[in-house]
Protein backbone atom coordinates (compact mmCIF):
# COMPACT_ATOMS: atom_id res chain seq x y z
CA UNK A 1 0.00 0.00 0.00
CA UNK A 2 1.20 3.53 -0.80
CA UNK A 3 1.35 5.70 2.32
CA UNK A 4 1.41 9.38 1.42
CA UNK A 5 3.46 11.79 3.52
CA UNK A 6 1.16 14.75 3.07
CA UNK A 7 2.51 17.22 5.61
CA UNK A 8 5.80 17.71 7.44
CA UNK A 9 6.80 19.72 10.48
CA UNK A 10 10.37 19.67 11.76
CA UNK A 11 12.84 21.41 14.01
CA UNK A 12 16.54 20.71 14.51
CA UNK A 13 19.86 22.53 14.67
CA UNK A 14 19.37 23.51 11.01
CA UNK A 15 16.28 25.57 11.81
CA UNK A 16 12.69 25.66 13.00
CA UNK A 17 10.80 25.64 9.69
CA UNK A 18 10.82 23.65 6.46
CA UNK A 19 12.11 26.67 4.58
CA UNK A 20 15.04 27.37 6.89
CA UNK A 21 16.02 23.72 7.23
CA UNK A 22 15.92 23.28 3.43
CA UNK A 23 18.05 26.34 2.76
CA UNK A 24 20.73 25.38 5.26
CA UNK A 25 20.60 21.66 4.45
CA UNK A 26 21.28 22.08 0.74
CA UNK A 27 23.89 24.79 1.38
CA UNK A 28 25.81 22.49 3.73
CA UNK A 29 25.53 25.06 6.54
CA UNK A 30 26.72 23.42 9.75
CA UNK A 31 26.67 26.58 11.87
CA UNK A 32 24.00 24.95 14.02
CA UNK A 33 26.62 22.56 15.37
CA UNK A 34 27.97 24.38 18.43
CA UNK A 35 30.51 23.55 21.13
CA UNK A 36 28.91 23.40 24.57
CA UNK A 37 30.24 22.49 28.00
CA UNK A 38 28.31 20.94 30.85
CA UNK A 39 27.08 17.81 29.09
CA UNK A 40 30.06 15.66 30.09
CA UNK A 41 32.70 16.41 32.73
CA UNK A 42 35.71 18.59 31.97
CA UNK A 43 35.26 19.20 28.26
CA UNK A 44 33.14 20.92 25.66
CA UNK A 45 31.61 18.91 22.84
CA UNK A 46 29.98 19.84 19.52
CA UNK A 47 26.23 19.27 19.66
CA UNK A 48 23.34 19.89 17.29
CA UNK A 49 21.31 22.07 19.66
CA UNK A 50 18.03 23.82 18.86
CA UNK A 51 18.53 27.47 19.80
CA UNK A 52 15.16 28.94 18.80
CA UNK A 53 12.48 29.58 21.42
CA UNK A 54 10.14 26.63 21.93
CA UNK A 55 6.38 26.90 22.43
CA UNK A 56 5.11 26.37 25.98
CA UNK A 57 3.15 23.23 26.78
CA UNK A 58 -0.56 24.21 26.84
CA UNK A 59 -2.08 24.48 30.35
CA UNK A 60 -4.58 21.69 29.67
CA UNK A 61 -1.71 19.20 29.28
CA UNK A 62 0.86 20.85 31.55
CA UNK A 63 1.71 17.57 33.28
CA UNK A 64 3.41 16.54 30.02
CA UNK A 65 5.91 19.40 30.36
CA UNK A 66 9.33 18.46 28.94
CA UNK A 67 11.76 19.79 26.36
CA UNK A 68 11.10 16.67 24.31
CA UNK A 69 7.40 17.48 24.10
CA UNK A 70 8.13 21.14 23.39
CA UNK A 71 10.20 20.11 20.37
CA UNK A 72 7.37 17.84 19.24
CA UNK A 73 4.84 20.62 19.74
CA UNK A 74 6.99 23.00 17.66
CA UNK A 75 6.91 20.50 14.79
CA UNK A 76 3.18 19.83 15.18
CA UNK A 77 2.27 23.52 15.14
CA UNK A 78 3.85 23.82 11.69
CA UNK A 79 1.21 21.41 10.32
CA UNK A 80 -1.64 22.31 12.68
CA UNK A 81 -3.98 23.23 9.81
CA UNK A 82 -3.37 19.90 8.06
CA UNK A 83 -4.02 18.06 11.32
CA UNK A 84 -7.25 19.97 11.92
CA UNK A 85 -8.48 19.14 8.43
CA UNK A 86 -7.69 15.45 9.00
CA UNK A 87 -9.62 15.46 12.29
CA UNK A 88 -12.60 17.08 10.61
CA UNK A 89 -12.52 14.61 7.74
CA UNK A 90 -11.74 11.33 9.50
CA UNK A 91 -12.74 11.91 13.11
CA UNK A 92 -10.59 11.89 16.25
CA UNK A 93 -10.95 8.13 16.66
CA UNK A 94 -9.52 7.34 13.23
CA UNK A 95 -6.23 9.21 13.62
CA UNK A 96 -3.26 7.45 15.20
CA UNK A 97 -0.10 8.79 16.81
CA UNK A 98 3.10 6.72 16.47
CA UNK A 99 6.32 8.36 17.62
CA UNK A 100 9.91 7.19 18.01
CA UNK A 101 12.10 8.41 20.87
CA UNK A 102 14.99 7.27 23.01
CA UNK A 103 15.00 10.03 25.63
CA UNK A 104 11.41 11.14 26.23
CA UNK A 105 11.59 13.46 29.28
CA UNK A 106 14.60 11.82 30.88
CA UNK A 107 16.43 15.11 31.40
CA UNK A 108 13.56 16.51 33.48
CA UNK A 109 13.54 13.24 35.44
CA UNK A 110 17.29 13.49 36.07
CA UNK A 111 16.95 17.05 37.35
CA UNK A 112 14.07 16.05 39.61
CA UNK A 113 15.99 13.06 40.95
CA UNK A 114 18.91 15.35 41.77
CA UNK A 115 16.54 17.52 43.82
CA UNK A 116 15.17 14.44 45.57
CA UNK A 117 18.67 13.24 46.46
CA UNK A 118 19.45 16.62 48.02
CA UNK A 119 16.13 17.39 49.68
CA UNK A 120 14.31 14.04 49.88
CA UNK A 121 11.36 15.51 48.04
CA UNK A 122 10.54 16.01 44.37
CA UNK A 123 10.03 19.49 42.89
CA UNK A 124 6.42 20.68 42.84
CA UNK A 125 6.35 20.69 39.04
CA UNK A 126 7.59 17.10 38.66
CA UNK A 127 5.21 14.46 37.31
CA UNK A 128 6.01 10.92 36.22
CA UNK A 129 4.33 11.55 32.87
CA UNK A 130 7.21 13.87 31.97
CA UNK A 131 9.66 10.97 31.80
CA UNK A 132 7.42 8.08 30.74
CA UNK A 133 8.72 6.56 27.52
CA UNK A 134 5.27 6.78 25.93
CA UNK A 135 4.97 10.46 26.82
CA UNK A 136 5.42 11.95 23.32
CA UNK A 137 2.51 10.01 21.80
CA UNK A 138 0.36 10.47 24.91
CA UNK A 139 1.06 14.20 24.88
CA UNK A 140 0.14 14.67 21.21
CA UNK A 141 -3.02 12.58 21.56
CA UNK A 142 -4.09 14.49 24.68
CA UNK A 143 -3.35 17.92 23.19
CA UNK A 144 -5.22 17.14 19.96
CA UNK A 145 -7.92 15.09 21.76
CA UNK A 146 -7.32 12.10 19.51
CA UNK A 147 -8.63 8.67 20.49
CA UNK A 148 -7.01 6.48 17.84
CA UNK A 149 -4.03 4.20 18.57
CA UNK A 150 -1.23 6.16 20.25
CA UNK A 151 2.11 4.66 21.22
CA UNK A 152 5.86 5.12 21.18
CA UNK A 153 8.57 2.94 19.66
CA UNK A 154 12.01 2.96 21.26
CA UNK A 155 14.65 0.96 19.39
CA UNK A 156 17.49 3.46 19.81
CA UNK A 157 18.60 4.97 16.48
CA UNK A 158 15.90 3.23 14.40
CA UNK A 159 13.00 4.34 16.64
CA UNK A 160 11.40 6.87 14.33
CA UNK A 161 12.12 4.90 11.16
CA UNK A 162 10.13 2.10 12.77
CA UNK A 163 7.43 4.62 13.66
CA UNK A 164 6.97 5.41 9.95
CA UNK A 165 6.94 1.72 9.07
CA UNK A 166 4.39 1.02 11.82
CA UNK A 167 2.22 3.94 10.71
CA UNK A 168 2.03 2.50 7.22
CA UNK A 169 1.02 -0.86 8.69
CA UNK A 170 -1.71 0.81 10.75
CA UNK A 171 -3.16 2.32 7.57
CA UNK A 172 -2.80 -0.96 5.70
CA UNK A 173 -4.61 -2.88 8.45
CA UNK A 174 -7.46 -0.38 8.54
CA UNK A 175 -6.73 0.68 12.13
CA UNK A 176 -6.46 4.33 11.12
CA UNK A 177 -7.27 6.65 8.24
CA UNK A 178 -4.41 9.00 9.10
CA UNK A 179 -1.38 8.76 11.36
CA UNK A 180 0.81 11.42 12.93
CA UNK A 181 4.18 9.71 12.85
CA UNK A 182 7.79 10.68 13.33
CA UNK A 183 10.32 11.09 16.07
CA UNK A 184 11.70 13.35 18.76
CA UNK A 185 14.76 13.37 21.00
CA UNK A 186 16.33 16.09 23.09
CA UNK A 187 19.85 16.62 24.35
CA UNK A 188 20.37 15.24 27.84
CA UNK A 189 23.31 14.43 30.09
CA UNK A 190 22.43 10.75 30.42
CA UNK A 191 22.70 10.18 26.67
CA UNK A 192 25.85 12.21 26.11
CA UNK A 193 27.62 10.74 29.11
CA UNK A 194 26.59 7.25 28.01
CA UNK A 195 28.07 7.65 24.55
CA UNK A 196 31.12 9.28 26.11
CA UNK A 197 31.56 6.20 28.31
CA UNK A 198 31.44 4.07 25.15
CA UNK A 199 34.23 6.29 23.74
CA UNK A 200 32.00 6.96 20.74
CA UNK A 201 31.95 10.78 20.95
CA UNK A 202 34.14 12.95 18.76
CA UNK A 203 35.69 16.03 20.38
CA UNK A 204 35.56 17.69 16.95
CA UNK A 205 32.87 18.06 14.31
CA UNK A 206 32.13 14.57 13.05
CA UNK A 207 33.83 13.36 9.88
CA UNK A 208 31.87 10.43 8.40
CA UNK A 209 33.65 7.88 6.20
CA UNK A 210 36.98 9.68 6.51
CA UNK A 211 40.18 7.89 7.42
CA UNK A 212 40.29 10.44 10.27
CA UNK A 213 36.79 9.74 11.63
CA UNK A 214 36.69 9.41 15.40
CA UNK A 215 33.09 9.35 16.58
CA UNK A 216 29.68 10.95 16.64
CA UNK A 217 28.17 14.31 17.51
CA UNK A 218 24.79 14.21 19.27
CA UNK A 219 21.88 16.43 18.25
CA UNK A 220 18.24 17.04 19.10
CA UNK A 221 15.26 17.25 16.77
CA UNK A 222 11.61 16.56 16.11
CA UNK A 223 10.12 15.54 12.76
CA UNK A 224 6.42 14.85 12.34
CA UNK A 225 4.57 13.62 9.26
CA UNK A 226 0.86 13.35 8.55
CA UNK A 227 0.51 10.03 6.71
CA UNK A 228 -2.65 9.02 4.83
CA UNK A 229 -3.76 6.71 2.03
CA UNK A 230 -4.43 9.61 -0.35
CA UNK A 231 -2.07 12.06 -2.01
CA UNK A 232 -2.00 15.73 -1.10
CA UNK A 233 -3.15 18.14 -3.80
CA UNK A 234 0.30 19.78 -3.89
CA UNK A 235 2.52 16.68 -4.25
CA UNK A 236 2.54 12.89 -4.20
CA UNK A 237 5.51 12.19 -1.91
CA UNK A 238 5.02 8.84 -0.22
CA UNK A 239 6.65 6.11 1.80
CA UNK A 240 6.98 3.59 -1.01
CA UNK A 241 8.93 0.84 0.70
CA UNK A 242 10.52 -0.25 3.95
CA UNK A 243 12.84 -3.03 5.00
CA UNK A 244 13.72 -4.20 8.50
CA UNK A 245 16.21 -6.71 9.83
CA UNK A 246 17.77 -7.63 13.15
CA UNK A 247 21.09 -9.45 12.92
CA UNK A 248 21.55 -9.42 16.75
CA UNK A 249 25.32 -9.39 16.27
CA UNK A 250 26.21 -7.40 19.40
CA UNK A 251 24.55 -5.18 21.97
CA UNK A 252 26.26 -2.04 20.62
CA UNK A 253 28.59 -2.92 17.71
CA UNK A 254 27.29 -3.48 14.16
CA UNK A 255 27.73 -6.75 12.29
CA UNK A 256 31.06 -6.05 10.51
CA UNK A 257 30.20 -7.42 7.05
CA UNK A 258 27.05 -5.29 6.78
CA UNK A 259 24.85 -8.34 6.28
CA UNK A 260 21.92 -7.03 8.33
CA UNK A 261 22.09 -3.57 6.80
CA UNK A 262 22.23 -5.05 3.32
CA UNK A 263 19.19 -7.22 4.05
CA UNK A 264 17.20 -4.16 5.16
CA UNK A 265 18.06 -2.25 1.97
CA UNK A 266 17.19 -5.19 -0.27
CA UNK A 267 13.89 -5.72 1.56
CA UNK A 268 13.01 -2.06 1.09
CA UNK A 269 13.70 -2.29 -2.64
CA UNK A 270 11.56 -5.41 -2.96
CA UNK A 271 8.80 -3.83 -0.90
CA UNK A 272 8.79 -0.77 -3.16
CA UNK A 273 9.10 -2.94 -6.31
CA UNK A 274 12.18 -1.01 -7.37
CA UNK A 275 15.66 -1.89 -8.58
CA UNK A 276 18.77 -0.45 -6.96
CA UNK A 277 19.52 1.51 -10.14
CA UNK A 278 16.25 3.45 -9.70
CA UNK A 279 17.33 5.07 -6.42
CA UNK A 280 18.44 8.65 -7.06
CA UNK A 281 19.89 9.40 -3.62
CA UNK A 282 20.83 7.48 -0.48
CA UNK A 283 20.86 9.11 2.96
CA UNK A 284 23.43 7.09 4.89
CA UNK A 285 23.28 6.33 8.59
CA UNK A 286 26.88 7.60 8.54
CA UNK A 287 27.64 8.16 12.22
CA UNK A 288 31.41 8.70 11.74
CA UNK A 289 32.30 5.85 14.08
CA UNK A 290 34.92 3.39 12.90
CA UNK A 291 32.62 0.37 12.90
CA UNK A 292 29.41 1.86 11.48
CA UNK A 293 31.04 3.51 8.50
CA UNK A 294 33.08 0.43 7.64
CA UNK A 295 30.03 -1.83 7.84
CA UNK A 296 27.75 0.55 5.95
CA UNK A 297 30.26 1.05 3.14
CA UNK A 298 30.35 -2.70 2.56
CA UNK A 299 26.56 -2.95 2.67
CA UNK A 300 26.06 -0.09 0.20
CA UNK A 301 28.61 -1.57 -2.20
CA UNK A 302 26.80 -4.88 -1.99
CA UNK A 303 23.43 -3.35 -2.93
CA UNK A 304 24.45 -0.49 -5.22
CA UNK A 305 27.22 -2.06 -7.27
CA UNK A 306 26.84 0.63 -9.95
CA UNK A 307 27.00 3.43 -7.38
CA UNK A 308 24.41 5.85 -6.01
CA UNK A 309 24.69 9.53 -4.97
CA UNK A 310 24.88 9.47 -1.19
CA UNK A 311 25.72 11.48 1.90
CA UNK A 312 25.57 11.45 5.66
CA UNK A 313 23.66 14.46 6.96
CA UNK A 314 24.80 14.00 10.57
CA UNK A 315 27.57 16.62 10.21
CA UNK A 316 24.70 19.11 9.71
CA UNK A 317 22.25 18.00 12.39
CA UNK A 318 24.21 15.78 14.73
CA UNK A 319 23.03 12.25 15.42
CA UNK A 320 19.53 12.83 16.75
CA UNK A 321 19.18 9.21 17.91
CA UNK A 322 15.49 8.33 18.31
CA UNK A 323 14.54 11.19 15.98
CA UNK A 324 17.20 10.45 13.35
CA UNK A 325 15.18 8.11 11.14
CA UNK A 326 12.27 10.53 10.80
CA UNK A 327 14.53 13.58 10.50
CA UNK A 328 16.56 12.05 7.69
CA UNK A 329 13.39 10.83 5.97
CA UNK A 330 12.31 14.46 6.23
CA UNK A 331 15.53 15.53 4.50
CA UNK A 332 14.58 13.21 1.64
CA UNK A 333 11.05 14.68 1.66
CA UNK A 334 12.49 18.20 1.41
CA UNK A 335 14.69 17.07 -1.49
CA UNK A 336 11.58 15.90 -3.36
CA UNK A 337 9.31 18.81 -2.37
CA UNK A 338 8.07 21.14 -5.12
CA UNK A 339 9.82 24.04 -3.37
CA UNK A 340 13.22 22.46 -4.16
CA UNK A 341 13.10 23.77 -7.70
CA UNK A 342 16.84 23.26 -8.24
CA UNK A 343 16.57 19.54 -7.36
CA UNK A 344 19.38 20.01 -4.82
CA UNK A 345 20.66 17.05 -2.81
CA UNK A 346 22.04 17.12 0.75
CA UNK A 347 25.85 17.40 0.54
CA UNK A 348 28.33 15.08 2.23
CA UNK A 349 30.57 17.13 4.54
CA UNK A 350 33.94 15.67 5.49
CA UNK A 351 37.65 16.34 5.13
CA UNK A 352 37.89 14.44 1.83
CA UNK A 353 40.42 11.97 3.23
CA UNK A 354 38.99 8.67 2.01
CA UNK A 355 39.66 5.59 4.10
CA UNK A 356 41.63 3.24 1.82
CA UNK A 357 40.15 0.27 3.70
CA UNK A 358 36.57 1.19 2.73
CA UNK A 359 34.83 0.77 -0.63
CA UNK A 360 34.63 4.07 -2.50
CA UNK A 361 31.16 5.65 -2.50
CA UNK A 362 29.65 8.32 -4.75
CA UNK A 363 29.57 11.42 -2.54
CA UNK A 364 27.29 14.39 -3.08
CA UNK A 365 28.51 17.96 -2.63
CA UNK A 366 26.94 21.40 -2.29
CA UNK A 367 26.30 21.58 -6.04
CA UNK A 368 24.85 18.08 -6.47
CA UNK A 369 21.48 17.83 -8.18
CA UNK A 370 18.97 15.08 -8.80
CA UNK A 371 19.52 14.74 -12.54
CA UNK A 372 16.83 13.78 -15.07
CA UNK A 373 18.52 10.40 -15.36
CA UNK A 374 17.91 9.77 -11.64
CA UNK A 375 14.43 8.63 -10.68
CA UNK A 376 12.75 10.56 -7.87
CA UNK A 377 13.19 7.73 -5.38
CA UNK A 378 15.35 8.10 -2.29
CA UNK A 379 16.48 5.65 0.37
CA UNK A 380 17.32 6.47 3.98
CA UNK A 381 19.21 4.11 6.29
CA UNK A 382 18.99 3.82 10.08
CA UNK A 383 20.98 1.28 12.08
CA UNK A 384 20.77 0.77 15.84
CA UNK A 385 22.17 -1.13 18.80
CA UNK A 386 21.46 -4.83 18.78
CA UNK A 387 21.74 -5.06 15.00
CA UNK A 388 18.38 -3.36 14.51
CA UNK A 389 18.30 -2.11 10.90
CA UNK A 390 15.73 -0.11 8.91
CA UNK A 391 15.78 1.23 5.35
CA UNK A 392 13.01 3.47 4.03
CA UNK A 393 12.27 4.45 0.43
CA UNK A 394 10.56 7.78 -0.15
CA UNK A 395 9.57 9.08 -3.54
CA UNK A 396 6.89 10.25 -5.92
CA UNK A 397 4.07 7.74 -5.97
CA UNK A 398 2.94 6.59 -9.42
PLM feature segments, named:
Residues 33-77, 94, 104-118, 123-166, ...:
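Conserved catalytic cysteine-centered active-site region
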Residues 1-61, 230-242, 330-349, 390, ...:
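ACP-dependent fatty acid/polyketide chain-elongation machinery
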Residues 13, 103, 156, 287-289, ...:
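Glycine-rich phosphate/pyrophosphate-binding beta-alpha loops
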Residues 1-5, 65-81, 87-91:
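N-terminal amphipathic, basic-rich helices that act as targeting or association modules
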Residues 85-96, 113-125, 142-150, 172-179, ...:
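Structural signature of cysteine-dependent C-C bond-forming condensing enzymes
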Residues 2-11, 27-37, 42-45, 201, ...:
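Condensing-enzyme catalytic core mediating Claisen C-C bond formation in acyl metabolism
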Residues 72-84, 134-136, 222, 257-273, ...:
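Short, well-ordered amphipathic alpha-helical segments that serve as non-catalytic structural scaffolds
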Residues 7, 25, 76, 97, ...:
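Conserved small-residue
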Amino acid sequence: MTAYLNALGLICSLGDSREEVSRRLFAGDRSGMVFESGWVPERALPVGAVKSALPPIPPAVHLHRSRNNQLLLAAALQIEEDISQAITRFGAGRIGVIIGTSTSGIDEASESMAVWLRERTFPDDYDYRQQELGAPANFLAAWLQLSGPAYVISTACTSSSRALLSARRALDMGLCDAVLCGGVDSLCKLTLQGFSALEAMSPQLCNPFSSNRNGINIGEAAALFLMTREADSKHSIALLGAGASCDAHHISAPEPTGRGARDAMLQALRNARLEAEQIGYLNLHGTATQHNDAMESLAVQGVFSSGVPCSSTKPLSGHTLGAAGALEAAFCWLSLAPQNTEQALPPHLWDGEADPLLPALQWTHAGSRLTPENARYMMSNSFAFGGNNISLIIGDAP
